[in-house]
Amino acid sequence: MLDAQQIQDIIPHRYPFLLVDRILEVEGEKRAVGIKNVTVNEEFFNGHFPGYPVMPGVLIVEALAQVFGVIMLGKEENKGKIGLFAGIDGCRFKRQVKPGDQLRLEVEVTRLRGPVAKGKAVATVDGEVACEAELTFSIGPKVS
């Protein structure tokens, strides 16, 4: 299990754009599961939507991409590099995510070719699918 600080040791995201609170499982270069506890204090709820707070779908996808980043950037040869979101296919939103929900973020690598990987990504709340997509991730340059 990785806490927020350990996640930040792997991926370059920081507040307010770090959207993963914990990593529960990492299976080498194959799979990872993360958690995002969605609170009423999230800044995006101020405008999305007043009186009816719903987590923006693009941020759910970003949270999934960050879990993908933990898989790819956790590899020794990629330490210190940046991960780039390179594509999305078949994205579907099936459930609204609201304050008080806990997002379970699961990514499984389905194809790896050099610095580019594809993965099946699923975000769930209480076992219900909130979002699913196929993501493409690319390894970028080292950052300082």
Swiss-Prot record:
It is found in: Cytoplasm. Coiled coil: none annotated. Keywords: Cytoplasm, Lipid A biosynthesis, Lipid biosynthesis, Lipid metabolism, Lyase. Its main location: cytoplasm. It holds the Pfam family FabA. Its EC number is 4.2.1.59. It is an enzyme of class 4 (lyase). GO terms for molecular function: (3R)-hydroxyacyl-[acyl-carrier-protein] dehydratase activity. It catalyses: a (3R)-hydroxyacyl-[ACP] = a (2E)-enoyl-[ACP] + H2O. One of its GO terms (biological process) is fatty acid biosynthetic process. The keyword Cytoplasm applies. GO terms for cellular component: cytoplasm; membrane. Belongs to the thioester dehydratase family. FabZ subfamily. PANTHER family: 3-HYDROXYACYL-[ACYL-CARRIER-PROTEIN] DEHYDRATASE (PTHR30272:SF1). Involved in unsaturated fatty acids biosynthesis. Catalyzes the dehydration of short chain beta-hydroxyacyl-ACPs and long chain saturated and unsaturated beta-hydroxyacyl-ACPs. This is 3-hydroxyacyl-[acyl-carrier-protein] dehydratase FabZ. It comes from Bacillus pumilus (strain SAFR-032). The lineage of its organism: Bacteria, Bacillati, Bacillota, Bacilli, Bacillales. The gene is fabZ.
